[in-house]
């Protein structure tokens, strides 16, 4: 058994380095394990004796006695003792290295348990003066909230022995990437108390998201093969027989046996252990009292959940998951750690053979074991999870929704920024400007920087100016003042003589030109020489970072800055030039994205300047620019801050005075020397004073965090420039502390002293290093900004300046008051206090005020937080090239508000503001206030401020709280980004953290739920999104910090790739519109109506709709007619039997080719003439009669692929008088889902016989088919190619009112229905279509659609025979094989009319988008096409048709010819664009009015506008009205309601097997309750509206002449709202009814100015009712599709009032979690709905029917039955 303490020193150092590499992410977990095992190999062979047993637990565990109970201690295998609450208290990273933590099980359990039985914990500071132990003693002793401040008495006597070990062990502490982030211990305690307080409340468990196994394997360190979505309440218990033993990977046992506070229940099995095992480690589960966390209704004696990864079982996994081998990781002990009796995982979900992603048929394959998944409660796994989510949401919220329902944005805005009447108000007097001391320039200080360099370079040329350390910590090169001077002169001379070619012209650099300085962070010496070279030449340097690696931020923002500054030359070093990205072809330096073309100039190896070259004779103006420094704003745009020469030298003088710099001092600099504090001190002020700077590159700091302290000790440095993270890192490097002496240090400048976490790092650093000579007055926090430079600085030594010597201060402030912008002192022990330290006083010669951060710059009150503004001779001058922003930032005149008394004494008191003086102040971007004695307190920055529901929160404060949520072992300390995003008019807080690689799924969720609670209770603000990303995934700044803007940008564009996401919109979003409530009168009407309507309730039959002639209160009633069929020739007027027509055609034109079938190559596969069709039909009739014994009126099922056999079989049945039912054949690749549907239709239609072709008959009887349908149970099956013995006698005579065929189809809601079509309907439908589309024998019509139901069937089989035109048939599956097939056919056969489906349009648009040039080469010309009708039963898909038209316009397609038809179950063709009708009209309606069942017309491009296009033109003989689906009242024009249709070709009722036609009876004979109450209509089941429209022949968009209605009109107004439109349309006033104006159709052009357009909005059954409003899924889906380019398809449905969004991810599985926040944001923003569940699935999972419509109900069933195999399921809280 090894303790690292017993290892030799060199091994310990190597181990520490390894740990550091792992924590930095420089080495993989696997490589780490390997190297570590190798290192420890020689020391592992020592025998383990009794001494092991007596090893005390390491002193960094806060061992607590669990309520003095006599249980055997709740001990994790890590030795982490657990209190009865189920917390584990571990300091953030114990000094044991992480892997040791994970692998070593050193302490015998009984031994440790015995220790934990010691008496109640008492106070005592354990161990070395570690920085974790800083909490002041005292306070609530029994509180479980402290980390490591108290140890049980059992440890007191061991302390002395442990101290040395403790110190040694700290050497292995992980040093994490803690870029300037550091947490306050006070906060830590507050967080723990807050969490403890919350713990008392019974908490419903939040469901944990489900991840697919492969995603789990990808996410850091998770080998748990967790079931895709399981939940412990709904899983049958199973046990493994005790003889099976499994070896667990060690980290699983250690990390997951303890469920720390199961707020979120992980998806795990219930354990089923016998009590006999309590002596084993399993004891710990039973100790954790489970009562507190189970949902309130569960009995306390439930077994606690067993938090272990499921074990591998012998069941085979499906083909896509390789069997998992659980291998043990390197083990230090030889004993195998065996565990018995855990449950086998449920792998049933993957047992089905791998499903092909076939959309059309996806989810009926529930294998047997899945059916048994439901337990006694009968709940599905998913449903249990959603139940949990619902219970969570039922919890009363702290902030109720404001009570209002409003459509418009102003109200949403007001709701987002509520004013709290109880908010504290500032009470102090108005502040006065604070003056810094007078600037006294020491005698002999050089006049300018150039003079300084010349003086020191000649007089003391050997004294060192700068030294840089190499990555090993050795001093490599020192730059003396002499060398600096000569090199800078060389550069200045070279730059003045070098000629750069800028395109054709030659240019030299003139004084005042701007150049870029591009140097790596480890080469300050070249940077300084180049900087002073530019100074000597009068050039303006702009130092920039060079992103060398792809993980850095995109450099294009910097490129914009370079372009705007007009920079063409970049100075760089040779080494840096070599590292620049080169172009592969030319080998030259590649042009970076967004960058201008640069000339690179290397500043080394330059010739000596000639004797006469004198740098001193350049006299630059003081107001000229000296340099430009880049800075970024909140949104991430990069700006250049221009600094004048006067400001630069003044600032150096002020720093010299404030810091008491003298010549020859040594400074150590850890900061970035290219900008801000690092640049001002180490490059500029140091040269002015002739000081020596030692630079420590960031790479060395990562490797040896204490190197800066060692340098101070070695060089006796007097000043040091650091950030608080360097103090923190230095504290952790305890092994180096013994040799350090900081007594020479007079100033330790903390550059980010303004951050809330800097206070505790300063305090702890001082407490540890005071013993090493550090003086308390040496620590100098300062505040700075690029605009103001140094805002304030605590003076070193304190005594010499004019302020009181003891001028340091700290304030304990109330965070709640700060969020309202007010300073209030809080008590020390308050949970919600923030402790701030001062940032010193105002700089010499500067004047400071604090002004309001919003609105005009009015002076703040003394107790008010505002933005700090400074005026002095040493601030920046402007943002380069941005005049507007410059004026608002650099030219601020603070205003003083005064009350003006009215003259006559009785008027109102006015507030007037006047400037306090002439001076212009500069905004610093820092928020704060001035304390007593002129001390400056900074409590945030303008960029880090988040205003959530009217209260201000500082990102840094939230980071501090997040960091204090222990245990920190789940995430990396400093790698946290907090920012806000604007969603639904308010800012929402997002927290992104980097997760450690060894953190399991449950642990990270445990941690996330604690963070939510901590932030909520301390800041009273909800976190909207909390995400964990894999290690090193947050974008970095060049010095290793987090690049916040870039992280935010990636988050918003969906390229951050988080490993875990928790969204909490339900608790954060409090400004949703109030749900609508029904009016009283309407509710009763709604109750009376029996229909399953969609909840349209606001047009009840009431006084508003009193009938006035044919108008409702001046508004037309919604009614429209197609033209009269009577205008056609006489033969069309009387109905004809289709069989008679066919026989007539066979006699009169026997050789006329009537059908042509094409194959996938576009070649003619088969043709049929009229006589061939007639003969084959006769033959099939004979076959049916002879072999099938079919009588007239019998039902025959036709199962054929799209083709000519289907036609012949159909007419064969009609000849016989039998009733055919066409059925789509089953899909050979997907039999087990498609075959049951086929069988169902055969059964439901009562077909006595099946007619088909040989391949399909074989398929029906195959072995594969037998698994789902027994082949013996089919009715008799006939082969169409069999020959009958006799000829068929004669065509049966049937009546017009007998059934011709049954039309079966499955609706999008999954309802299978068959409608009965009589011969009369069939004949009138054909007549109507023939008339509208002008079809006659010489026409060619191309059809590319499915011939099984609706209009597709009519076009394919009936209309060609009726009108005799030539039909060119293309089966849609052929187009999948050859996407250009349909278009090339149109071109080749010069087709004028074509009918297709949306599936075909989509396929062409997607597959051919890049092939237009090649199609042109093949001479494909679409100018011949006159009408292209998309056959659909839904709202026309405007976007898709527009894309299609735009794409193929290039091939001559006239965009006006594409239109959509509308048909439905009750009538297959209501609207079809005719041959001579005008193009479809578009209108824009307000989406928010639509969801309240109103139609409000708006202009194109208006917010919330939705483009709706009319569905073709009404067919001749069709009459359509709009009725309220609930009340059956007649609606007015432009009102939303159900479309009712009256036509001779309506279907004649449903044919259903169950005979329950009661419910659907009124679908075919509905009557209005107002108006013409005697007429019968068929109800289409679709919502829509009618609108009188001008037939514009030109512009398809809303014409300027159409007045738009105000986008909102209330329920009562909407009746009148459209009436003003009528004034424009003279026809309306002439003849109120549209019949007169439309009679004559095309014949009379004057009459065709107006027509009634039918606009379909969506199916009644599909409407989603949420929060009292009605949404159409397509609208939500369109929003979701737009939110990320990787979303291939999307479908939404509701389940128990939760909105579920399913998105198909067309990309890498690692991108799945990017979609969750984006989907949630988009739906909130566009529809004001909160998404409850986001399911990310593979492409092809959303099922789609043959018409290209989504089967949302199938999808829902598949989701609830857990058959989707999702990549990720996120449950939004």
Curated annotation (Swiss-Prot):
UniProt family annotation: Belongs to the DIP2 family.
Residue numbers carrying Phosphotyrosine: 60-61
Keywords annotated in UniProt: Cell membrane, Developmental protein, Membrane, Neurogenesis, Phosphoprotein
UniProt topology in membrane: Peripheral membrane protein
SMART domains the record matches: DMAP_binding
Comp. bias intervals (Basic and acidic residues): 176-185, 241-253
The protein's assembly and partners: Interacts with Disco.
Top-rank taxon: Eukaryota
Protein name: Disco-interacting protein 2
Function per UniProt: Required for precise axonal bifurcation in mushroom body neurons by suppressing ectopic bifurcation and regulating the guidance of sister axons. May function by regulating expression of tdp1. Acts downstream of the serine/threonine-protein kinase Bsk to modulate the direction of axon projection. May play a role in fatty acid metabolism.
Listed Polar residues bias regions: 113-125, 146-165, 272-297
Gene Ontology cellular component annotations, sorted alphabetically: plasma membrane
Intracellular or extracellular location(s): Cell membrane
Entry keyword annotation includes Cell membrane: yes
Organism: Drosophila melanogaster (Fruit fly)
Cited InterPro entries: AMP-bd_C, AMP-bd_C_sf, AMP-dep_synth/lig_dom, ANL_N_sf, Dip2-like_dom, DMAP1-bd
Cross-referenced PROSITE patterns: DMAP1_BIND
Ranges annotated as biased composition (Basic residues): 166-175
Gene Ontology biological-process entries: acetyl-CoA biosynthetic process; axon guidance
Principal cellular location given in the protein's record: membrane
Acidic residues composition bias: residue spans: 224-236
A Pfam family annotated for this UniProt entry: AMP-binding
């Amino acid at each position: 058994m090894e303790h690292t303490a017993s290892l030799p020193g060199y091994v310990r150092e190597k181990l520490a380095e390894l740990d550091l590499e792992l924590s930095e992410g420089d080495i993989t977990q696997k490589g780490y394990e390997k190297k570590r095992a190798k290192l420890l190999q020689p020391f592992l062979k020592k025998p383990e004796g009794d001494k092991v047993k007596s090893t005390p637990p390491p002193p960094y565990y806060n061992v607590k006695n669990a309520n003095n109970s006599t249980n055997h201690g709740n001990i994790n295998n890590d030795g982490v003792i657990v209190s009865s609450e189920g917390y584990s208290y571990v300091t953030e990273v114990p000094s044991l290295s992480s892997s040791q933590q994970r692998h070593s099980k050193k302490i015998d359990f009984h031994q440790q348990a015995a220790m934990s039985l010691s008496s109640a914990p008492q106070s005592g500071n354990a161990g070395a003066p570690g920085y974790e132990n800083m909490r002041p003693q005292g306070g609530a002793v029994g509180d479980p909230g402290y980390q490591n401040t108290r140890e049980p008495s059992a440890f007191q006597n061991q302390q002395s022995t442990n101290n040395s070990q403790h110190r040694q062990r700290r050497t292995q502490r992980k040093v994490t990437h803690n870029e300037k982030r550091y947490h306050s211990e006070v906060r830590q305690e507050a967080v723990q108390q807050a969490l403890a307080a919350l713990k008392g409340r019974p908490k419903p468990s939040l469901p944990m998201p489900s991840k697919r196994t492969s995603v789990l394997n990808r996410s850091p360190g998770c080998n748990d093969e967790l079931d895709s979505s399981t939940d412990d309440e709904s899983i049958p218990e199973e046990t493994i027989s005790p003889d099976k033993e499994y070896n667990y990977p060690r980290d699983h046992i250690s990390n997951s046996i303890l469920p720390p506070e199961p707020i979120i229940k992980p998806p795990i099995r219930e354990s089923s252990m016998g009590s006999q095992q309590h002596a084993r480690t399993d004891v710990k589960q039973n100790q954790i009292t489970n009562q507190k966390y189970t949902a309130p209704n569960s009995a306390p004696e439930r077994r606690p959940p067993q938090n272990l990864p499921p074990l591998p079982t012998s069941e085979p996994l499906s083909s896509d998951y390789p069997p998992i081998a659980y291998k043990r990781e390197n083990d230090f002990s030889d004993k195998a750690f065996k565990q018995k009796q855990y449950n086998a995982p449920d792998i049933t979900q993957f047992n089905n053979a791998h499903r092909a992603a076939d959309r059309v048929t996806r989810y009926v394959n529930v294998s047997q074991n899945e059916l048994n998944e439901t337990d006694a409660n009968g709940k599905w796994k998913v449903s249990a999870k959603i139940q949990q989510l619902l219970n969570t949401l039922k919890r009363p919220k702290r902030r109720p929704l404001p009570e209002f329902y409003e459509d418009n944005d102003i109200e949403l805005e007001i709701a987002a920024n509520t004013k709290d009447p109880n908010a504290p108000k500032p009470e102090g007097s108005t502040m006065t400007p604070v003056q810094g001391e007078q600037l006294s320039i020491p005698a002999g200080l050089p006049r300018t920087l150039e003079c300084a360099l010349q003086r020191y370079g000649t007089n003391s040329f050997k004294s060192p100016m700068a030294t840089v350390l190499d990555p090993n910590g050795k001093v490599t090169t020192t730059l003396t003042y002499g060398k600096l001077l000569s090199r800078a002169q060389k550069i200045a001379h070279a730059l003045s003589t070098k000629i750069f070619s800028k395109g054709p012209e030659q240019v030299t650099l003139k004084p005042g030109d701007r150049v870029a300085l591009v140097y790596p962070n480890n080469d300050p010496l070249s940077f300084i020489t180049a900087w002073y070279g530019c100074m000597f030449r009068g050039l303006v340097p702009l130092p920039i970072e060079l992103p060398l690696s792809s993980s850095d931020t995109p450099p294009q923002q910097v490129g914009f800055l370079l372009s705007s500054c007009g920079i063409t030359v970049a100075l760089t070093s040779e080494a840096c030039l070599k590292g620049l990205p080169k172009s592969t072809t030319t080998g030259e330096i590649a042009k970076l994205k967004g960058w201008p073309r640069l000339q690179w100039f290397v500043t080394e190896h330059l010739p000596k300047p000639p004797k006469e070259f004198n740098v001193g004779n350049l006299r630059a103006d003081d107001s000229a620019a000296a340099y430009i420094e880049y800075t970024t704003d909140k949104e991430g745009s990069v700006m250049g801050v221009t600094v004048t020469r006067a400001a630069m030298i003044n600032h150096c003088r002020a720093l010299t005075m404030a810091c008491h710099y003298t010549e020859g001092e040594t400074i150590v600099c850890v900061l970035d020397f290219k900008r801000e504090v690092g640049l001002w001190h180490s490059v500029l002020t140091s040269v002015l004073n002739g000081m020596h700077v030692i630079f420590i590159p960031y790479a060395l700091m990562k490797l040896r965090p204490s190197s800066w302290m060692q340098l101070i000790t070695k060089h006796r440095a007097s000043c040091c420039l650091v950030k608080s993270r360097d103090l923190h890192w230095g504290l952790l490097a305890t092994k180096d502390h013994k040799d350090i002496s900081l007594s020479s240090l007079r100033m330790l400048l903390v550059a980010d002293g303004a951050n809330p976490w800097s206070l505790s790092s300063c305090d702890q650093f001082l407490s540890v290093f005071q013993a090493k000579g550090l003086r308390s007055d040496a620590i100098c926090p300062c505040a700075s900004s690029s605009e103001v430079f140094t805002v304030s600085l605590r003076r070193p030594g304190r005594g010499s300046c004019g302020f009181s010597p003891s001028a340091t201060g700290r304030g304990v402030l109330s965070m709640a008051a700060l969020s309202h912008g007010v300073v209030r002192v809080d008590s020390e022990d308050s949970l919600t206090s923030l402790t701030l330290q001062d940032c010193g006083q105002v700089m010499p010669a500067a004047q400071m005020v604090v002004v309001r951060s919003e609105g005009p710059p009015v002076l703040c009150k003394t107790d008010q937080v505002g933005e700090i503004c400074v005026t002095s001779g040493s601030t920046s001058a402007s943002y380069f090239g941005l005049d507007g922003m410059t004026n608002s930032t650099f030219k601020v005149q603070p205003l003083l508000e005064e009350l003006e008394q009215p003259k006559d004494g009785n008027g109102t008191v006015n507030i007037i503001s006047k400037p306090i003086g002439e001076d212009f102040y500069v905004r610093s971007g820092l928020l704060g206030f001035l304390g007593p004695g002129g001390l400056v307190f900074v409590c945030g920055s303008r960029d880090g401020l988040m205003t959530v529901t009217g209260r201000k929160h500082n990102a840094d404060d939230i980071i501090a709280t997040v960091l204090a949520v222990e245990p920190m072992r789940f995430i990396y300390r400093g790698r946290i980004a907090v920012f806000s995003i604007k969603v639904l008019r308010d800012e929402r807080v997002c927290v992104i953290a980097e997760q450690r690689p060894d953190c399991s799924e449950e642990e990270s969720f445990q941690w996330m739920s604690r963070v939510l609670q901590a932030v909520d209770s301390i800041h009273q603000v909800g976190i909207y999104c909390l995400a964990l990303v894999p290690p090193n995934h947050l974008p970095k700044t060049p010095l290793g910090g987090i690049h916040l803007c870039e992280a935010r940008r990636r988050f918003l564009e969906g390229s951050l790739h988080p490993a875990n996401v928790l969204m909490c919109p339900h608790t954060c979003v409090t400004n949703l519109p109030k749900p609508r409530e029904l009016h009283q009168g309407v509710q009763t009407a709604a109750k009376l109506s029996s229909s399953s309507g969609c909840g349209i309730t606001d047009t009840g039959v009431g006084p508003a709709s009193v009938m006035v002639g044919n108008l409702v209160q001046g508004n037309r009633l919604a009614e429209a007619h197609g033209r009269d069929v009577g205008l056609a020739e006489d033969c069309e007027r009387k109905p004809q039997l289709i069989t008679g027509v066919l026989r007539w055609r066979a006699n009169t034109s026997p050789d006329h080719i009537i059908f042509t079938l094409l194959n996938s190559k576009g070649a003619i596969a088969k043709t049929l003439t009229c006589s061939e069709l007639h003969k084959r039909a006769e033959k099939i009739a004979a076959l049916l009669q002879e072999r099938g014994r079919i009588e007239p009126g019998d039902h025959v099922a036709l199962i054929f692929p799209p083709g000519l056999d289907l036609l012949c079989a159909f007419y064969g049945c009609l000849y016989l008088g039998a009733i055919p039912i066409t059925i789509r054949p089953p899909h050979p690749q997907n039999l087990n889902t498609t075959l049951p549907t086929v069988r169902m239709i055969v059964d439901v239609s009562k077909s006595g016989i099946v007619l088909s072709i040989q391949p399909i008959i074989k398929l029906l009887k195959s072995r594969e088919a037998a698994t789902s349908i027994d082949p013996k149970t089919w009715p008799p099956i006939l082969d169409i190619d069999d020959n009958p013995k006799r000829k068929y006698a004669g065509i049966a005579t049937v009546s017009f009112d007998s059934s011709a065929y049954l039309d079966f189809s499955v609706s999008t809601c999954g309802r299978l229905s068959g409608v009965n079509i009589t011969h009369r309907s069939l004949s009138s439908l054909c007549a109507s279509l023939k008339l509208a589309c002008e079809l006659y024998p010489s026409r060619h019509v191309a059809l590319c659609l499915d011939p099984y139901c609706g209009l597709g069937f009519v076009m394919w089989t009936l209309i060609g025979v009726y009108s005799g035109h030539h039909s060119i048939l293309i089966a849609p599956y052929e187009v999948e094989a050859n996407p250009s097939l349909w278009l090339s056919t149109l071109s080749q056969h010069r087709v004028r009319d074509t009918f297709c489906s949306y599936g075909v349009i989509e396929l062409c648009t997607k597959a051919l988008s890049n092939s237009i040039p090649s199609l042109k080469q093949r001479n494909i010309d679409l100018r011949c096409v006159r009408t292209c009708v998309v056959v659909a039963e839904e709202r026309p898909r405007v976007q898709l048709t527009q894309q299609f038209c735009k794409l193929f316009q290039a091939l001559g397609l006239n965009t006006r010819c594409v239109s959509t038809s509308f048909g439905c179950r009750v009538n297959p063709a209501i609207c079809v664009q005719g041959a001579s009708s005008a193009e479809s009209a578009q209108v824009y309606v307000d989406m928010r009015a639509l969801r309240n069942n109103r139609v409000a017309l708006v202009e194109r491009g208006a917010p919330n506008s939705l483009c709706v296009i009319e569905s073709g033109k009404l067919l001749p003989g069709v009459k359509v009205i709009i009725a309220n689906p609930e009340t059956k009242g007649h609606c007015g024009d432009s009102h939303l309601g159900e479309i009712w249709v009256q036509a001779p070709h309506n279907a004649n009722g449903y044919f259903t097997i169950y005979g329950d036609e009661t419910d659907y009876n009124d679908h075919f004979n509905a009557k209005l309750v107002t108006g013409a109450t005697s007429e019968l209509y068929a109800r289409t089941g679709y919502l829509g509206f009618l609108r009188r429209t001008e037939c514009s022949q030109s512009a398809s968009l809303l014409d300027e002449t159409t007045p738009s209605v105000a986008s909102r009109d209330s329920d009562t107004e909407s009746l009148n709202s459209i009436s003003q439109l009528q004034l424009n349309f003279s026809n309306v006033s002439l003849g109120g009814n549209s019949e007169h104006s439309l009679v004559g159709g095309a014949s009379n052009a004057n009459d065709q100015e107006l027509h009634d357009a039918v606009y379909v909005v969506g199916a009644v059954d599909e409407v989603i009712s949420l929060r009292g409003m009605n949404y159409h899924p397509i609208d939500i889906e369109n929003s979701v599709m737009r939110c990320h380019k990787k979303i291939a398809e999307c479908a939404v449905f509701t389940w128990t009032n939760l909105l579920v969004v399913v998105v198909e991810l067309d990309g890498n599985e690692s991108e799945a979690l990017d979609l969750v926040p984006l989907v949630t944001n988009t739906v909130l923003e566009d529809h004001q709905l909160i998404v409850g569940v986001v399911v990310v699935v593979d492409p092809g999972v959303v099922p789609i029917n043959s018409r290209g419509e989504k089967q949302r109900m199938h999808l829902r069933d598949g989701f609830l039955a857990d058959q989707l195999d999702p990549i990720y399921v996120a449950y939004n809280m």
